[in-house]
Amino acid sequence: MNIVYRFRIYPNKSQKELFARTFGCVRFVYNRMLAEKNEYYEKTGKVLKVTPAKYKAEFPWLKEVDSLALCNAQLHLQTAYKNFFRDSSAGFPKFKSKKNPVRSYTTNCVNGNITLQNGKLKLPKAGWIRIKQHRSIDDRYILKGATVSQEADDKYYVSLLYVAEEPEHEIRSVKTAIGLDFSMRELYVDSHGAHADYPHFFRKSQEKLAREQRRLSHCEKGSSRYMKQKKKIARLHAHIARQRKDYLHKESRKITNFYDLVCIESLNMKEMSQDSRFGTSVHDNGWGMFTDFLSYKLERAGKKLVRIDKWYPSSKICSCCGKLKKELKLEDRIYSCTCGNQMNRDENAAINICREGLRILGVELETERKIS
């Protein structure tokens, strides 16, 4: 099982210069290989096999950076091709732009060339770097690689990839379960009637973002004032992203600690984000990120996440009598049934999602437990 830990790092001036050169070399090798492969295929109809080593004689400055970072550029290009041929919607491999505000490179741990100890991280070519290690790492985990990134706000981070043994936990009897129904307004409503009460970080900052964007539009493109304002906007976006990520981590941890089984709907977030009615809410809520966090946290704890088919009519089924209500509009926020049941539409759906998850798993709920 792969586990990734992300920490902030504080490189000195020379290390920042090395990272900048490495980012540039990785981008250069990736783009060069992509261009040559495309050109060769157009001429011959065959696939060109090329490695970064080919370019070092012609471009000796490539030897100044970590060679494993260049090798990983080749692997990333191969992955991009595989993704495209497996599913064309992934898109054909594209050239990497120098203007991308987020830059990164990946290297591998070989013969102890990457070491983490005493608040410092050792990386190939860069040496020892100060790191903010805010959490401990199990000594049994094996370090396999590191990805160094520079975010749009000019802060540096490292993502350390560890390999751990697969947990041997297996759910034998589910004592606690919960269903979550995606909510545009509150992230989710659960099967006990609790609402996530999502803070909507993006919406709260929209006015400030719009103001900074207007200031940017008044700057001359390419000027120092323009670049300074652009970085200011990037820092604001990065701050919003960190707020969202922190909230979703804490919310998914709370649910994981309380429940053995979590049931959710399989929603196509890409399609929903393109809908004019949902776009901003889907982007702001981060439901896809939230379910990813839930998935790996539950897996590590030996617990279960069940995804219900997106065509399952969770909103239309009465959670009391089981009757299907065919006519139910999106604006109908209260579910009313002829049996007398009247409740919040999302809560009704969450109860049905939980029951369907239990049915799929083939277990019966022994006790109920609510998050306090």
What name fits each language-model region?
Residues M1-S372:
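Nucleic-acid substrate recognition interfaces
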